[in-house]
Amino acid sequence: MVEKTILEAVKKVVEESPKRNFSESVDLAINLKNLDMNQPKNRVDEEVILPHGLGKELKIGVFAKGDVGLKAKAAGAAYVISDVELEELAADKNRARVLANECDLFIAETQFMPIIGKNLGIVLGPRGKMPIPLMPNKDVGELIQSKQNAVKLRSKDRLTFHVAVGRRDMNPEDLAENIETIMSRLERVLDKGKHNLRTVYVTTTMGKSERVV
């Protein structure tokens, strides 16, 4: 059972925002307080699995070869980058930037990680898209599926940051449950829990916003 105030805020934002000819993202605008963000321990850097996903297919790039590459493709990876293609990307930073902008996230077999760090870190690092290492005992298909429902809560050194919680055409109850999942994680990781939350607003990409905290 989702909290009534969150559900009402979601419904109001979805119903009262002007209709668009595309499916808008629904986001949370999170404002923290009473934290020194110059201290790394106060920064939020969490991955949260949303119970109802984001309402869209994420574009995932996988650095892999052989059977792992084939399994990644079968599991829905948008791009599978072999060791040969990785060398080509390392020599063509413009192409690497295009790929980095197209993909929502990357996964890489562990043997690829040092090469990626050395040659593509300058492209992927600032975008927060350094690959998730695929450990030898992990199934690439399962990892891809879990990441389809995951979002990153990342404040960096700012008190204000945003995170997507779904799409406007999703069921309001599902959006509200996604929001509750994020709020619960935030309250757990913040030093003083909900007392470090100044405000939290739910908003659409180009529409109105409603306060939930």
From Swiss-Prot:
Keywords annotated in UniProt: Repressor, Ribonucleoprotein, Ribosomal protein, RNA-binding, rRNA-binding, Translation regulation, tRNA-binding
An MF annotation (GO) of this entry: tRNA binding
Any Pfam family: Ribosomal_L1
GO biological process: regulation of translation; translation
CDD domains: Ribosomal_L1 (cd00403)
PROSITE patterns from the UniProt entry: RIBOSOMAL_L1
One term under GO cellular component: large ribosomal subunit
UniProt key word Ribosomal protein: yes
Subunit text: Part of the 50S ribosomal subunit.
Function summary: Binds directly to 23S rRNA. Probably involved in E site tRNA release. Protein L1 is also a translational repressor protein, it controls the translation of its operon by binding to its mRNA.
Family to which the UniProt record says this protein belongs: Belongs to the universal ribosomal protein uL1 family.
Name of the featured protein: Large ribosomal subunit protein uL1
Organism name: Methanosarcina acetivorans (strain ATCC 35395 / DSM 2834 / JCM 12185 / C2A)
